[in-house]
Amino acid sequence: MTESTTIRWEQDDTGVVTLVLDDPDQSANTMNAAFRDSLAAITERLEAERDSIRGIIVTSAKKTFFAGGDLRDLIRVTPDTAQELLDGGLAIKRNLRRIETLGKPVVAALNGAALGGGYEIALACHHRIALDAPGSKIGCPEVTLGLLPGGGGVVRTVRLLGITDALLKVLLQGTQYSPRRAQENGLVHEVATTPDELIAKARAFIDANPQSQQPWDKPGYRIPGGTPANPKFAANLPAFPASLRKQTNGAPYPAPRNILAAAVEGAQVDFETAQLIEARYFVELAAGQTSKNMIQAFFFDLQAVNSGANRPKGIASRPVRKVAVLGAGMMGAGIAYSCARAGIDVVLKDVTPEAAAKGKAYSEKLCAKAVSRGRTTQEKADALLARITPTADPQQLAGCDAVIEAVFEDTSLKHKVFQEIQHIVEPDALLCSNTSTLPITALAEGVERQVDFIGLHFFSPVDKMPLVEIIKGERTGDEALARAFDLVRQIKKTPIVVNDSRGFFTSRVIGQFINEGVAMVGEGIEPASIEQAAAQAGYPAKVLSLMDELTLTLPRKIRNESKRAVEEAGGTWPGHPAEAVIDRMVDEFGRTGRSGGAGFYDYDENGKRAGLWPGLREHFTREGAESPSETVPFEDMQERMLFSEALDTVKLLEEGVLTSVADANIGSIFGIGFPGWTGGVLQYINGYEGGLPGFVARARALAERYGERFTPPALLVEKAEKGERFSDAR
């Protein structure tokens, strides 16, 4: 019998066996080859010693219960190794099933997070008890990595909750529940408040249920809510894929489709066949490119970014105690709330007490909503609000060890507000400017301590957007960069680090996406087709509606400033076909965007979109083309948007504005809505059909048809010729 290396067997004198999950080679337990072998050995021993066993408790020696599949293994799966993955997965499922049907009570004592494979192990137990530990989460988030639960999660949640609830509450959204919410939604049976109580409750269940079995193994069991064999359920079945398509906007996310198929098909067959169906759909996803893209971005890249891969080494952390937020408008109010929520005292300053109080009112509104929805208590909300002091008096900023300026995008105004307070705050206070486009090096000229000056580009709405783009100016010191990084992590956001340049990374690259969509309008392409192309490419916001939200005048202002800067430096402005469209929209038609009541869309008196402006078809046509929407392939529309952002990102690497592939991928997804299925803007190139050579060939084809802006940069061509990928691996 194979020895168990990752599962410890502990048996007391009452006949209760505790299986302690404890991989000696990892900080967290995962469903790797060592676990598979250990599970097989443990299963054989349980069956051999069945008569001396009264019950089984499954728990963990780690801080978390079980972390799920080993993503380092899964990201390497190819069609050639798919059979090996299928066989290994089925072996795990068979052994969990053998334990589940052993005829003894089996209890999962979840001492920490049980996500993915961890919750699937718990599902194979007859009773699930979760410790109400801080940060503990329960659920099946595989869909967020382009996968489905492949260890029995689809099969068992469908039989536990029914097809509809399993899909909506667990599988399709990847929801991660706190222990108490997991209990409310039927994912666990009990919640314990201490580790001792956790084990005591597990033993109590064993004592009370000596002949326990799963509900679905009892004679006459029916899946809650019915199956497609039920005419009433079958009549509603066509709504499932329709709803799914609406949820994804038709973007190429294969995981939700496979989850739906595995759930519905598995509900119509016996348990073992359902397990095989689930396994095949899982392996199809694991061997595909989308899951590799999403695992790279949402696990490996995100982990690298948040762990400080780009934080200067050897500099001690200095948590911010008191922050001054200059400007109580939309951005300043959101920044103040985010800081106060993280436990930092905030002085929110504006030019008048009324303006400052209005900024605090934003936090009051958010807190009231959170209390009404049960997401916080009134006591916690009051404590958060007490940390925000609105003021118009600069002297109240005394003692602040960090400053975040969030006034209007005007260099002279930003200089003025810093000069007003730089001698009042702490003498070594970190000085941060929230700007989306203005060069940080020039802004730093307005303060005396340029070494402590840095850019923090927050995204709107600040309380919801997880990313902050940190911009290092030419004279920004390493200590300021480290402190800024730590401040972003302190307020529980994800920091990416870039070097100074007009537009930095995110603002410059999203501009390419917008320009390409607008350029297509100028070519006479049906505007609704352009919007649909963006949606089906996976963008969360359609390109023309996004342009209206930003206003047409802002990009034009930024373009004119950038053009002037390039020409003053002796360069040549490249221009873009979108510029003529924007100029006509503003100057000829007076359509400046949503705030002006008219843009690419019409708006009603309440500011609600009333449809695309019919004048777009009338005023923008391509000469000699009867129907550009027919002559320009839909795939070209999508890839023009995707490629425009990817190619400009490579240029930013060439220019040294970007220094990290992980920062580029995470920044593009979390900051500017690059489609998640791609794994980010550079992983999109890596994962493109044919790899980098395939991407280069396609870029050249687009350049030949649509303009030299699609010509692949030298760095991309060089990497393609060398057979390399975009990676931070040294």
Task: Give a label for each model feature.
Residues 66-76:
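Glycine-rich loop at the start of a catalytic domain that most often binds anionic cofactors/ligands
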Residues 95-108:
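Conserved catalytic cysteine-centered active-site region
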Residues 132-137:
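Short glycine-rich donor-binding/catalytic loop of glycosyltransferases
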Residues 1-59, 83, 94-97:
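Conserved CoA-thioester-binding segment of acyl-CoA-metabolizing enzymes
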Residues 108, 112-118:
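Gly/Ser-rich catalytic serine loop of serine hydrolases
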Residues 10-12, 22, 76-81, 86-91, ...:
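N-terminal glycine-rich phosphate-binding loop for ADP-containing cofactors
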